[in-house]
């Protein structure tokens, strides 16, 4: 049993046991403030090196943004939202789809990156409305990158 500064015992609560508070107060607000979030990501040497290729731009032009959004929703729902995604940390390829590039650029590629950058607790499924926030964030990055 843990104790506080005065020696009073208390039951430690893991971050995953209070997911809504952690998400609502930190992550969702940070992701919705795209300018601040993108500025923060640009300061990372690793994150700032990701950009859409010409092939990615052609793919977006061929498929349209509505299709890219559907792909994004599917990738987030199946590869990122489960409490313990299969192959976590390796589930997002480094190339091959504009959404994959956006996920790495925006630190939304695995649960470890979501936890580190956006305080999304590990081991807790991401609810549908929060998945939509991640999708909106990734699509905003793609739209910025794809702008002429």
PLM feature spans:
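Core of compact, soluble alpha-helical bundle domains
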Residues: 30-76
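Immediate flanking context of iron-sulfur cluster ligation sites
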Residues: 86-106
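Iron-sulfur (Fe-S) cluster-binding segments and ferredoxin-like electron-carrier domains
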Residues: 112-132
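Short Fe-S-cluster ligation motifs
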Residues: 132-148
């Amino acid at each position: 049993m843990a104790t506080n500064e005065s020696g009073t015992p208390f039951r430690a609560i893991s971050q995953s046991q209070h997911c809504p508070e952690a998400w609502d107060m930190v992550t969702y607000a940070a992701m919705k403030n795209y300018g601040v979030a993108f500025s923060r990501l640009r300061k990372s040497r690793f994150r700032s090196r990701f950009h859409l290729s010409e092939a990615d731009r052609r793919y977006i032009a061929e498929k349209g943004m509505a299709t890219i959004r559907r792909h994004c929703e599917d990738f987030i729902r199946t590869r990122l939202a489960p409490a313990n995604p299969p192959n976590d940390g390796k589930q997002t390829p480094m190339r091959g789809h504009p959404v994959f590039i956006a996920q790495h650029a925006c630190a939304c590629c695995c649960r470890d990156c979501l936890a580190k950058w956006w305080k999304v607790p590990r081991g807790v499924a991401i609810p549908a409305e929060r998945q939509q926030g991640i999708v909106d964030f990734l699509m905003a990055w793609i739209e910025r990158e794809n702008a002429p």
